[in-house]
Amino acid sequence: MSFDNLRYLESEAIHIIREVAATFSNPVVLYSIGKDSSVLLHLAMKAFFPGKPPFPFLHVDTRWKFREMIDFRDRMMREMDLKLIVHVNQDGIDQGISPFRDGSNVHTHMMKTMALRQALDKFSFDAALAGARREEEKSRAKERIFSIRNAQHAWDPKRQRPEMWRTYNTRVSAGETMRVFPLSNWTELDVWEYNQKENIPVVPLYFAAPRPVVQRGAGMIMVDDERMPLEPDETVTQRMIRFRTLGCYPLTGAIESSAETVPEILREIVEARTSERQSRLIDFDEAGAMEKKKREGYF
């Protein structure tokens, strides 16, 4: 990717972030700790330099994230001196919701979708910036940069507004909110090339290292803590792996890889023949799973 293209993508994203700050009364950044969130955080810092972003960062904690993700989150927020809101769906905790016992669909609905809706309502946020990209998944491919949600935080593809020549309709009615995706036009390759250019810190799990995994179905699941139950025929082995995408560890498959640096990751992406979200189990709960989740309020 040329430097000029990265500069255009950066300029577009910063313009969108500033547009949100200028037109909404109480925006927030959804910080999921992944590589896209790291780029979004970096862009938000650039957009308001030498000041700080005029809005908080929200992390919806499912209690099943990789431990390295939580350590990275806390370190970044502390070093940058940013306001972080961590929200957990206490109803889900009280019910003992688990991706192992209840499955990915129930877990995601309770601990991600419902938790996000609770947080947006609790703090009366009227706009939520997030790092989703159109290239990632087909339902995201057809979503606008400024994506209006109704009073129940649901997405209706038929209500999408035209977006032409970087002109955005930011108006919302009472009770409605807006999800905003400044990285909509970025690809996975763009994200990593920008990471290389700007030297953006990311969770170490993106880089290959020997890690404990079990082979489960067609995927490899990393054993991140003692809560993971093993099937009778499963054995934990050390393998050289990394992750292209990060989420709850029981629902995120690893890939075998020797890519320990950003240039090596870039070469691997160019040669890849599968989507980066191919290893995210929540995308395959049912036909049209991601669009259904978005209609229910998922980011």
Swiss-Prot record:
Any one GO MF term held by the record is: ATP binding
What this protein catalyses is: sulfate + ATP + H(+) = adenosine 5'-phosphosulfate + diphosphate
Name the Pfam families for this protein.
PAPS_reduct
EC primary class:
transferase
Assigned EC number: 2.7.7.4
Which residues does UniProt assign to the signal peptide? none
Q: What is the effect of changing residue 63 to P?
A: In strain: CIAT899
Entry keyword set: ATP-binding, Nodulation, Nucleotide-binding, Nucleotidyltransferase, Transferase
Q: Which GO terms describe its biological process?
A: hydrogen sulfide biosynthetic process; sulfate assimilation
Q: InterPro entries, alphabetically?
A: PAPS_reduct_dom (IPR002500), Rossmann-like_a/b/a_fold (IPR014729), SO4_adenylTrfase_ssu (IPR011784), Sulfate_adenylyltrnsfr_sub2 (IPR050128)
**Function recorded in the entry:** Proposed to provide activated sulfate for transfer to nod factor.
Cited NCBIfam families: CysD (TIGR02039), PRK05253.1 (NF003587), PRK12563.1 (NF009214)
Its quaternary organisation is: Sulfate-activating enzymes, NodP and NodQ, may be physically associated.
**What family is this protein classified in?**
Belongs to the PAPS reductase family. CysD subfamily.
Under what name is this protein listed?
A: Sulfate adenylyltransferase subunit 2
Q: Which organism is it from?
A: Rhizobium tropici
Per the record, the gene is nodP
